[in-house]
Amino acid sequence: MAHAECSLLSEADFVMTTDRSVFYISDGTAITAEVLGHAVLSQFPVNITSLTLPFVENVQRALAVKAQINALYQQSGVRPLVFFSIVTPEVRDIIVQSDGFCQDIVQALVAPLQQELGLSPAPVAHRTHGLDASNLGKYDARIAAIDYTLAHDDGISLRGLEDAQVILLGVSRCGKTPTSLYLAMQFGIRAANYPFIADDMDNLKLPPALRAHQNKLFGLTIDPERLAAIRQERAENTRYASMRQCRLEVGEVEALFRTHQIRYLNSTNYSVEEIATKILDIMGLTRRMY
């Protein structure tokens, strides 16, 4: 990735260290800078301390950010890494003149794309995550998905399951709620979820309301050791968090999934983002960009 020109530094200014400070800067939400910057940094064995600075839209704000970057460099002797996306030239130039190692994450891709498309870019601040007449319908659909998911979290309601696009099943604390919310917020997916609790284990059955939507069911499971560790943080030294109880619940629920031929995924070693993406792929759900 090509980097923007920052202030000139001598060879003595380059310090090899795996501990680096990172700035994510934008004239919008800074989500794009965070996502792309994190994706690049994940390729390196570095320990980062990050600061996100959204809505750097004017000269005064840019000067304050530049001073912050320079002060950190003077204090640590190590150049901060700066991932930025700023449309206004005079604001952008101030950041570029800082003592950070500057990466204009969008511009690095714009030039080759301009050549391929045969078009000149027309940058507009807030276009990526902003709201206007062109995407209002998509925004409303995403909010509706979030509302639906919250109303059908943790088995709160089994009504309206015909409107669900996926129904997640699993024991308590296996990742159903965060995955459901991520599906709704990131992809506009209406996701319900239903927990199997300790009291269900003596006679574990699939509720009729769920059997009626067999094609929408997807199970999450988890290693008992990981489940016990998570539960210990919430309810230390209880039956709920014991290894014996965790093994029992996971075993019973996995058997239920197999009996009813419900597709399922072990969430132990996956992030919420990875779990959600795998569910979309396995269930054949269309992912939407917002």
Swiss-Prot record:
Keywords: Kinase, Nucleotide-binding, Serine/threonine-protein kinase, Transferase. Its EC number is 2.7.11.33, 2.7.4.28. Pfam families: Kinase-PPPase. It comes from the Bacteria. It catalyses: [pyruvate, water dikinase] + ADP = [pyruvate, water dikinase]-phosphate + AMP + H(+); [pyruvate, water dikinase]-phosphate + phosphate + H(+) = [pyruvate, water dikinase] + diphosphate. GO terms for molecular function: ADP binding; ATP binding; phosphotransferase activity, phosphate group as acceptor; protein serine/threonine kinase activity. ADP binds at G170, V171, S172, R173, C174, G175, K176, T177. Belongs to the pyruvate, phosphate/water dikinase regulatory protein family. PSRP subfamily. NCBIfam families: PRK05339.1. Bifunctional serine/threonine kinase and phosphorylase involved in the regulation of the phosphoenolpyruvate synthase (PEPS) by catalyzing its phosphorylation/dephosphorylation. This is Putative phosphoenolpyruvate synthase regulatory protein. It comes from Enterobacter agglomerans (Erwinia herbicola).
